[in-house]
Amino acid sequence: MDMLLLVLVCLLTCSGQMLQKQAVISWQRQPCSHWQKLFSPWLIASVVALGSGMLLWIYLLQRLPLSMAYPMLSINLVLVLIGSRLFFHEQISYHNWLGAGAIIIGALLLGGLL
């Protein structure tokens, strides 16, 4: 159960980052005031996702050793890489994919899952 919650923390954190990027894109398409930016739906959704992830993370820290849980957050780097390719059509190099593979292996080793 805790590992599923840890995956959810990663997904919420990654979603928050993707929503922030979408907020910036929407501001570039249609210039707006600082107040409009502050209350944009994309930014609000980002705050909700990141805030929910933080609360769930605090809950998990009560149940898992930090030395096991924290390395798993590095999976966020891989999720953002995949999301940036899928949702924003960013170009990802061969070296980036190799790095993502190394991150996954490292996170699993540090988290005691391999």
UniProtKB/Swiss-Prot annotation:
Any one biological process term the GO annotation gives = lipid A biosynthetic process
Q: Read off the Gene3D superfamilies from this record.
A: 1.10.3730.20
> Which pathway is this protein assigned to?
Bacterial outer membrane biogenesis; lipopolysaccharide biosynthesis
Keyword Oxidoreductase attributed = no
Query: By its UniProt entry, which InterPro entries does this protein fall under?
Result: EamA_dom, Flippase_ArnE, Small_drug/metabolite_transptr
Q: How does it sit in the membrane?
A: Multi-pass membrane protein
What residues form the membrane-spanning segments? 41-61, 64-84, 94-114
GO annotations of cellular component type: plasma membrane
Residue intervals of the EamA domain = 53-112
User: Could you name the domain of life of the organism this protein comes from?
Assistant: Bacteria
Its keywords, alphabetically, are: Cell inner membrane, Cell membrane, Lipid A biosynthesis, Lipid biosynthesis, Lipid metabolism, Lipopolysaccharide biosynthesis, Membrane, Transmembrane, Transmembrane helix, Transport
Spell out the molecular function terms from Gene Ontology.
Answer: carbohydrate derivative transmembrane transporter activity
Subcellular localization? Cell inner membrane
Tell me, in a sentence or two, what this protein's role is: Translocates 4-amino-4-deoxy-L-arabinose-phosphoundecaprenol (alpha-L-Ara4N-phosphoundecaprenol) from the cytoplasmic to the periplasmic side of the inner membrane.
Q: How does it assemble?
A: Heterodimer of ArnE and ArnF.
Q: Which family does it belong to?
A: Belongs to the ArnE family.
Query: What protein am I looking at?
Result: Probable 4-amino-4-deoxy-L-arabinose-phosphoundecaprenol flippase subunit ArnE
| Organism for this UniProt entry | Aeromonas salmonicida (strain A449)
List the lineage, top down.
Answer: Bacteria, Pseudomonadati, Pseudomonadota, Gammaproteobacteria, Aeromonadales
**In the UniProt record, what gene is named as encoding this protein?**
arnE
